[in-house]
A protein has these predicted regions:
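Predominantly transmembrane beta-strands of Gram-negative outer membrane beta-barrel pores used
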Residues: 34-36, 185, 283-285, 294-296
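Proline-rich low-complexity regions
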Residues: 39-41, 274-276, 333
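Conserved small-residue
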Residues: 156, 162, 166, 173-274, ...
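Extracellular/periplasmic, surface-exposed regions of secreted and cell-surface proteins
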Residues: 1-221
Length: 333
């Protein structure tokens, strides 16, 4: 840490982390580091002849940290589990095998991040603002690759994910007389999430309706876009041919995304993103002498939710009111 006249600030850190998680692959230890700098502009002479801005600091940082979070204690060691059986003579012998394949180079996941922003206090420190732009890229992700054609899954360092966006916090604190005080605060954070690379461009990790694919947000929802409802037989006849299955009036009409005049598996696409556009929060505090009251509120906006529990014809719970607007004849929906 270096501080020159409370005006120019520099800091740097270095750490060498070790984890027995990667002992078997010889990657127990790895190096991680970070750098940061700040400039307190209100310490400069050209900021002295004003009384609006009490404090203004420009700041920036860059660094890399490691992660060993793989979802299990010792991921480099496979567990022997039952794996089919075979007949030898008159005997049936139970088979055993590893529950996963381990990459011989399995090691630390690396998180590279940088950010720039500033801290500003105004009006005798009553108003405080702190906007920041951040960019974080996770490389060598510890990824469980699902097995293909009956093979066991594998654990590898593969893939790259980027998260970037803005963070803003603001607050106002003041007093009313000698006994009363109050404060208002708000924060906002945006996120742009994208998978930059995976095993290859055409590779997908599938979990129910969610997918992880190169070029898309992580865990996006994958399926058919719905354009409406087939109203009658003529509507079916003059619409793209549905090769997914037979349809009748009242069935959902899917979009012909690839434009080939047919509804096929290739028309499935991204239909939703579970990552919110932004998160937000508010807080209000009120004080009188030695008593304090604080209210915190928070929420998210812009994320889609995949819900299919209303699709069953044998409902275990009450149906949602949307069922009242179901299709029940030509032109009703």
């Amino acid at each position: 840490l270096y501080n020159y006249k409370n005006r120019y600030l520099l800091n740097a850190s270095f750490r060498r982390d070790g984890s027995s998680v990667f002992y078997k692959t010889g990657n127990t230890w790895d190096n991680f580091y970070s750098f940061g700098a700040g400039w307190v502009m209100t310490e400069e002479k050209f900021m002295q002849n004003q009384n609006v801005i009490n404090f203004l600091k420009l700041k920036g940082s860059w660094g890399v940290l490691g992660s060993q979070n793989t979802g299990s204690s010792y991921p480099a060691y496979a567990t022997i589990v039952s794996s089919g059986s075979a007949v030898f003579g008159d005997n049936i012998i139970a088979g055993k095998g590893p529950n996963k394949l381990i990459s011989p180079t399995l090691g630390w996941e690396r998180n590279y991040s940088w950010e720039v922003g500033f801290d500003m206090h105004m009006f005798n420190d009553r108003l405080q603002l702190s906007p920041v732009y951040y960019n974080k890229t996770t490389k060598d992700m510890l990824t469980s690759i699902p097995g293909i054609a009956g093979t066991v899954p594998g654990l590898q360092n593969v893939g790259e994910i980027r998260n970037r966006g803005f963070e803003l916090s603001a607050s106002w604190n003041d007093k009313i007389g000698e006994d009363w005080r109050y404060g208002l605060g708000a924060n906002l954070s945006t996120i742009d999430n994208k998978v930059l690379s995976l095993v290859n461009k055409d590779y997908n990790i599938i979990s129910g309706p969610s997918r992880v694919s190169e070029g898309y947000p992580i865990g996006y929802f994958y399926g058919y876009k719905v354009e409406g409802v087939y109203q009658n037989e003529d509507d079916i006849r003059f619409s793209p041919i549905n090769s997914v299955g037979s349809v009748t009036p009242g069935d959902l009409k899917f979009a012909d995304v690839d434009g080939n005049g047919k509804i096929t598996d290739n028309d499935r696409t991204m239909i939703g993103n579970p990552t919110p556009d932004f998160t937000y929060g508010f807080n209000v505090n009120l004080g009188w002498k030695n008593l304090d009251l604080t209210v915190d509120m928070m929420g998210v906006y812009g994320n889609e939710i995949y819900r299919n529990w209303g699709s069953s014809s044998y409902a275990q719970l009450n149906y949602r009111t949307e069922q009242l607007n179901r299709w029940h004849g030509e032109g009703t929906s």
